[in-house]
């Protein structure tokens, strides 16, 4: 088996679909010797900021001298990004070897595993073989029935900002969504919550009490955010002063405050994480595709906001970083998202939109998306490909800023197309 064949196997149609439940993952892991039982975890759930918070915590734990696994989704450029040890992606040959190891077990299961369950098993196997001392594990969807929730009590359960997303799978209210996320809270494990949504906070507090789990809510009154530049955001948080965070979204200091709070809670439970390591980890973290500046002048931004809650934060960042400016937006959005709410937030900042269809069956067709945009009185045109869309958006932008956003699923293609366009 080569890398392409391994990828074909992972993405094979027989694993397609979303089937909640932990039985299949447990069966698959048992056949592989239960590698997850050899590992310790930080488990991260939430609507927005999961990946950024996980990346920050992994960076800080690595700076503290630990061997750290990081499991995230989706990827931006290459699948291997989803499984990293100490900031290094799983090598192709290791991935092939592990797929060959998993295949006999997966192929003989009566209740067929999903793609995400196969990838979760792959990650667990790799982290165990790599002898990771701690794994930062990002939930795929929800919490309670997500395949990552096969783990025993984590060293810390972290719940990021909550908002309305995936209501079809998780339920129609913030309380339902919070209940799904709170499913990662295990008996007696420390919990750190972003908080700030009373309906959701009440659910998390109740579950933490039921599970005798020590709950810490982030004290954002101790966060002093100094604004920032197009290179870094500067902030102070609870004694940690003048931190230069290279993730420049205005919302990132709040994610950093959550990460810092969780790391300090872990320290009280015996983890050796000095303040100097927290600073180093935050100042050296890399997390592509989240309010990422690909070019300074004229500005070209790439952002992964893919729901109304995230879009609100991105729009605020655009206003903070580019005061008074209007944008050409290159947009693709999944058809199952609250498209109109997202567009209503973008419309006031738009000069024009260019729509494309991301390479996933869930994407709203570019022409349909353009019709939605025109309903807001904005000019919109479609492009036949992501490459053509990037070229057109840059052309329309002229000396003004361009921002590509709406889904993480086109981030890699946009990045590659932009690199090709400007390399000459």
Predicted regions and their residues:
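Hydrophobic alpha-helical packing residues
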Residues: 57-62, 127, 346, 373
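Beta-strand->loop->alpha-helix junctions that form or flank phosphate-binding loops
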Residues: 194-195, 207-229, 246-250, 278-284, ...
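N-terminal leader/targeting and accessory segments in enzymes
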Residues: 1-48, 52-67, 76-78, 190-193, ...
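C-terminal helical cap/extension that packs against the catalytic core
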Residues: 197-216, 230-231, 299-302, 308, ...
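Glycine/aspartate-rich loop-and-adjacent alpha/beta segment that forms the canonical ThDP
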Residues: 408-424
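Acidic, Mg2+-coordinating active-site environments of NTP-dependent enzymes
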Residues: 110-111, 118, 131-138, 154-242, ...
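Nucleotide phosphate-binding/pyrophosphate-handling subdomain across enzymes
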Residues: 37-38, 134-137, 145-158, 162-163, ...
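ATP-dependent carboxylate-amine ligase catalytic core
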Residues: 18, 22, 26-37, 63-152, ...
């Amino acid at each position: 088996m080569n890398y392409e064949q391994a990828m074909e196997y992972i993405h094979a149609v027989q694993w397609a679909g979303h089937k909640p439940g932990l039985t299949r993952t447990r069966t698959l892991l048992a056949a592989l010797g239960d590698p997850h039982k050899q590992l310790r975890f930080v488990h991260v759930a939430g609507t927005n900021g999961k990946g950024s918070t996980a990346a920050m915590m992994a960076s800080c734990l690595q700076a503290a001298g630990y061997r750290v696994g990081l499991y995230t989704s989706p990827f931006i450029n290459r699948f291997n990004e989803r499984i990293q040890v100490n900031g290094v992606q799983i090598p192709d040959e290791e991935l092939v070897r592990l797929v060959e190891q998993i295949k006999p077990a997966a192929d003989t299961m009566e209740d067929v595993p999903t793609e995400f369950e196969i990838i979760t098993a792959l990650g667990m196997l790799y982290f165990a073989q790599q002898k990771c001392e701690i794994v930062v594990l990002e939930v795929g969807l929800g919490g309670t029935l997500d395949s990552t929730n096969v783990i025993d009590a984590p060293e810390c359960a972290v719940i990021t900002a909550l908002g309305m997303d995936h209501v079809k799978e998780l339920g129609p209210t913030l309380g339902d969504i919070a209940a799904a996320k709170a499913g990662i809270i295990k008996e007696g494990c420390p919990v750190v919550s972003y908080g700030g949504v009373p309906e959701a906070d009440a659910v998390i507090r109740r579950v933490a009490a039921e599970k005798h789990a020590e709950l810490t809510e982030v004290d954002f009154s101790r966060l002093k955010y100094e604004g920032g530049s197009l290179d870094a955001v500067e902030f102070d948080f609870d004694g940690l002063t003048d931190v230069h965070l290279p993730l420049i979204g205005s919302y990132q200091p709040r994610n950093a405050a959550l990460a810092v709070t969780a790391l300090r809670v872990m320290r009280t439970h015996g983890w050796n994480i000095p303040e100097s390591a927290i600073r180093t980890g935050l100042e050296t973290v890399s997390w592509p595709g989240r309010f990422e500046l690909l070019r300074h002048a004229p500005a070209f931004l790439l952002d992964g906001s893919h729901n109304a809650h995230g879009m609100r934060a991105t729009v605020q960042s655009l206003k903070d970083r580019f005061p008074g400016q209007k944008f050409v937006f290159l947009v693709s959005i999944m058809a199952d998202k609250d498209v109109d709410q997202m567009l209503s937030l973008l419309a006031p900042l738009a000069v024009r939109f260019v729509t494309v269809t991301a390479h996933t069956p869930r994407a709203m067709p570019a022409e349909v998306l353009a019709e939605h945009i025109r309903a807001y009185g904005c000019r919109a045109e479609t492009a036949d490909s992501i490459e053509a869309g990037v070229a057109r958006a840059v052309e329309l932008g002229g000396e003004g800023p361009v921002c590509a956003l709406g889904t993480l699923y086109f981030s890699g293609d946009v990045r590659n197309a932009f690199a090709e366009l400007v390399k000459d």
